[in-house]
Amino acid sequence: MGRMNLLSKIHNAASNQVEGYCIVKSVAQKSNVKGSSYLDFILADAGGECVAKLWDYAPEQHGTYAANTVIKVRATINLWKEEEQLKIDRIRNVKADEAVDMAELIPCAPFAPEEMFEELYRCAEEFKDEDLRMLTQYILRENKAAILRFPAALKLHHAMRGGLLYHTTTMLKAAKAVCAVYKQLYPTLSTELVYAGIILHDVAKTQELVVGELGLASAYSEKGQLLGHINMGMAMVERAAAELMTDEHTTMLLQHMLLAHHGVPEFGSPRPPMFPEAEIVSQIDVLDSKLFEMYDALSGVPVGGFSERQWALDNRQLYKHGHV
């Protein structure tokens, strides 16, 4: 059937029939002017979203379909007030063992989550500092299931399935390049501290965000609202250190890097970076998040054009220059 997602087929359909997989963004029972009941869906995939209606449904179907789940539908394309929408002819929930490429349905990181996770774990495996190695690998193992699918944010940078790993592995690659330069100038720079700080800096996002099986965040958790991932990350390190009986000073340095990675109090860090490794972690975090947001904002802009103002980037308009 080629591409599995449904909505990309609407505009390229050879007939007025389409079939494929999509996400239920919302579903509600409604009635038309004649009193006939129907289920009103908003369906979505990586290509966008579309209104769809299920008429003449059986009473037992009400409650069968839920938001943030994957379904397969066969539908007829109709025009309503010059907008394309779907009349659902057949519909079913996806089976647990059904192979569905989630990258065609929702925004996903461009690399396999298992491979990105292994990149982080192998990096920690090479640490000569046993305490840093144990702390980092322990926290990765304890949170692996969530780390594999969590986004890095509710909105904005890396707010996609696997986005937390994408953000973290990109930062780690950047850190290795930066440390290769500055280690020559400042031999006492601890690359292992930098790498451990980067690997764990956002790990408590797995507790801060409410994320379903699709790997997209829908809200902040109660703890996320009240404590935030910086404080929760420090607590995760504290618990791991107590379990592993790691060196108190090394544990404190790692905690400081998590505490300071947002740089300044107005962005959530109660202390600024107070040693070079913490500064590197903070600066690379800012760089990666801002570059992601800039390229995302420019993705639909023609060469020579300007983006809309980006409030997350100090309300700047961005320019697409065309040079490569």
Where are these regions (language model features)?
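Acidic/His-rich, divalent-metal-binding segments that scaffold phosphate/diphosphate chemistry
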Residues: A99-G224
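OB-fold nucleic-acid-binding modules
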Residues: M1-E19
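Divalent metal-dependent catalytic cores for phosphoryl transfer on phosphate-bearing substrates
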Residues: L156, Y166, V181-V301
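N-terminal intrinsically disordered, cationic/polar leader segments
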Residues: S282, S289, S299-G300, G304-V324
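Divalent metal-coordination and catalytic microenvironments
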Residues: C22, N68, M171, D285
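OB-fold single-stranded nucleic acid-binding module
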Residues: S26-S37, C50-A103
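Short, acidic/hydrophobic/Gly-rich beta-strand patch recurrent on exposed beta strands
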Residues: D40-D45, V211
